[in-house]
């Protein structure tokens, strides 16, 4: 955007403000200029006002205490009008006139708040008084009590206002708190501040603080001071995300998140929200031109929204329902391209997806940004194929952590509600959505040893697979494909061993989908149903049904490696390690069998000594069907939180199992006495035996929840 275009845009904004807003905006720009620039502007203004006799008359009246005192006899409407006209013309140092104003202002403010009249005019008067160089710290302290009263009065009907008229008041409010924090009335500024009429300073001047007469307003801060009261008083100020403060130009509806302000000494001046974002993020010098790209509307975090508010005829697709553009500002922010939000604010979703470098170049977008935008849009186009790839990976039984991360990133990108072009396509989609595929459920039913558990598992899996019909979805149906993948993830979560991190990530992802406008009500109902199923199964589903499925058998080798001599036992967060359970059982069984003092081959040590897998209680529990049944019944009900809620103290037992167990059984002694004992050659056979033995010990240990020595 050319400089003249920026000036024209700023002029358009300026014409739409009232006089108080114009004054505040000009002051906020003046704080960026140097002393030479400020003096030049003063000369220009004085030269243009030499022949303005009417202004001279008003200025004389504004500084005459007798005339000001006479206004108390006038009606409130006329007094407010007189104050708005004369108060800005009060000269610093005129104590008598200032006292007269300070007596009159509280009466006007009290009347306006009590009768809910002239609220806007009262806000402007309070803004003038709080930023006027003639008012001292004590004067601003006396007016400070009206800040909250006025805001409380206007907060009730604030939503009905099309513009934020309290912006100028924020400046006065912030100036008061800055003066309270810096009561010594020191500032960086001109030594001859009275001659200038205003007290302007710049961190670029590199001058020592000098006294500012009468404690009047300093217009520049040596640091980017945020517009939040609670942050005042610290050297490193931070915008608090929980507070809402408005810019002096327009309330921002941008999604720009809060940021940290550079670690600089706190100054007296105040800054607008846009100024803070521009200076804090870009780090521009203090004497930078106010119409630079860093402070232009196309560059600020909220520039796009403000530009669209000013131009009522412009189209703001960020606010249109179902446009698919609501998440564009946040998406651009994640790409560090948020300063181009205004460029996208008038585009439709289809226009954005069809952008190319030529179109961006015509909009004066830099080469690097053009390339980055085009690449990012190309990635948006590839989301449908990526979802298909994720679906295949999930069906193959891979790790769910990576697909869940991809889905979390994708849900933050712009997604538009799918609208079928004809009724045949819509009917086709409905048929595809209503066809359940029970591939995993059928396999589970055939392998399950418990018919009741298999029936429950089949029911839940079929519900999760409802969106996963075999008929491919249309290319543009991104929400439908996303929902289908969510169904696949739900299925894998139900048929595999519980993973607390994956389940938590999945539930968070569903919550985002439920609040997303791109998903239909039918899809949201499915997602909500899956959420409830995952939560329910994670809390109360029998362990046997979760362990007998094909998804768990694919992870056998990993679990066996963890059980046999692995130091990384924390990788499995669904079942307690055999060593911890075995040692716990051994402690509460008094039967003692001394082990012959002989050396064992290293093979036996790795198999037997690593986790105490072959202790007497374990063998006894494995050979006792009644005990196994009781253990399975109490496995989940004695511990409603599931195996993930086991206390971490059981891990200490694993550290003790590097030597042979002290207590063992005659069967174990017989095994030790065999001179040629070796690990079986068939790996699946030993895997099955170790797994069965580990599960038996686990179920027996968890079933005894009332025992004080239990691992629960």
UniProtKB/Swiss-Prot annotation:
Cellular component annotations (GO), alphabetically ordered: cytoplasm; dendrite; synapse
> Cross-referenced InterPro entries, in alphabetical order?
PHAT_dom_sf, SAM, SAM/pointed_sf, SMAUG/VTS1_RNA-bind, Smaug_SAM
UniProt cross-references to Pfam families, sorted A to Z: SAM_1
One of its GO biological process terms is: regulation of mRNA stability
Q: Which CDD domains match?
A: SAM_Smaug (cd09557)
**Record domain SAM: where:** 321-381
Keywords associated with the record: Cell projection, Cytoplasm, Repressor, Synapse, Synaptosome, Translation regulation
Q: Which domain of life is it from?
A: Eukaryota
Q: Name one GO molecular function term.
A: RNA binding
Q: What is its main location?
A: cytoplasm
Q: What are the subcellular locations of this protein?
A: Cytoplasm; Cell projection, Dendrite; Synapse, Synaptosome
The region called Disordered is annotated at 278-325
This molecule's function is given as:
Acts as a translational repressor.
Q: Which family does it belong to?
A: Belongs to the SMAUG family.
Q: What is this protein called?
A: Protein Smaug homolog 1
